[in-house]
Amino acid sequence: PSSSGKTTFSHRLSVQLRAHGLRPYPLALDNYFVDREHTPKDENGNYDFECIEAMDLDLFHSDMKKLLAGEEISIPTFNFKQGRKEYKGKKLKLNAGDVLVAEGIHALNPLMTEGLSDDSKFKIYISALTQINIDDHNRIPTTDGRLIRRIVRDARTRGNDARETIAMWPSVRRGEEKYIFPYQEEADVMFNSALIYELSVIKQYA
């Protein structure tokens, strides 16, 4: 789900894969959003970034087929402030011993990896399952930790202030219930990215 630590985990996983003699290449699926003018809207007329239709599936499928065929691709970078993909000369070609580490909220959705054989995929579900309780009877919801993470991230990288992020959160949560949680059992493993000290650290940035 959103702000579960997918990007951080993919980079940490890449470090460990490299230590075992493999060559990992992290790939953020966020760079495969459709351009803003093609983004679907919800029932309130707001852009729905959480639905699978917000992803440029045709481009992603084409790039994956080329990579598996040994061809070189140009990797897009999505400019969230401008609302469009940009190409900045970043190339990628996979050789023997290379591992593509793809991360994104729809990575477990079968539509995202349609046409890719199951034996070429190892699926990991990541979430921040906060284990801190307020007292013996009240726990801190796991979504609270992710919301705080997202407030900090959006302010730093996407040009959104806290009010904008909080206003979008109900739509994000609806998207998770519809497009993400139904596929969590499809994962080969699950990883808890919550850190016991993180709320006290990131609160000053939120």
Go through the PLM ranges and name each one.
Residues 9-13, 28:
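Hydrophobic positions on the alpha1 helix immediately C-terminal to the Walker A/P-loop
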Residues 6:
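Conserved lysine of the Walker
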Residues 25-28, 50, 100-102, 123-125, ...:
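Structured core elements
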Residues 110-206:
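Conserved NTP phosphate-binding and transfer environment spanning the P-loop NTPase/kinase superfamily
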Residues 61-119, 169-183:
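Glycine-rich phosphate-binding loop used to anchor ATP phosphates in small-molecule kinases
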Residues 25-27, 34-83, 99:
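Conserved nucleotide-sensing/catalytic segment adjacent to the nucleotide-binding pocket
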Residues 3:
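Walker A (P-loop) phosphate-binding loop of P-loop NTPases
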Residues 15-25:
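Post-Walker A helix-loop "phosphate-sensing" segment adjacent to the P-loop in P-loop NTPases
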